[in-house]
């Protein structure tokens, strides 16, 4: 199946957008399904870094480990799920607009199902993400444009 892709323009510089979206501790602030995030290891986020992300889907919570595959500030990042029945694959790209005063953020999300995840991905996960992702991007835009981002 094709990745789910959403794009939004944000009135902040690519560096500001990149800094916020690639800090996994911010996920629960702008992603509706993200309950908590825990870094696995103490080092700064880099290629190879891992984080445990707990998400709520309906009334259930699931934790999966995501690993940073690519991290090219301030333009691109790629993280991939390495365990659990549903493994997300997230790629983000930031394009500068208006001489770098604004940014165009494109998020692309795909999934691999393992075991029960093979049934969950098409029946539950994809429909949920198709609804949530545009809302998440609007929330992110609001946080960044209000200056509330840490």
What are the roles of these predicted feature ranges?
Residues 7-11, 38, 67, 93, ...:
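Generic structural detector for well-ordered beta-strands
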Residues 57-62, 113-117:
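Short, cysteine-centered beta-strand-loop-beta hairpins and adjacent loop/turn segments enriched
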Residues 78-135, 142:
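Beta-strand/loop substructures that line and gate deep hydrophobic ligand-binding cavities in soluble
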Residues 2, 47-49, 60, 86, ...:
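Residue-level preference for beta-strand/loop junctions
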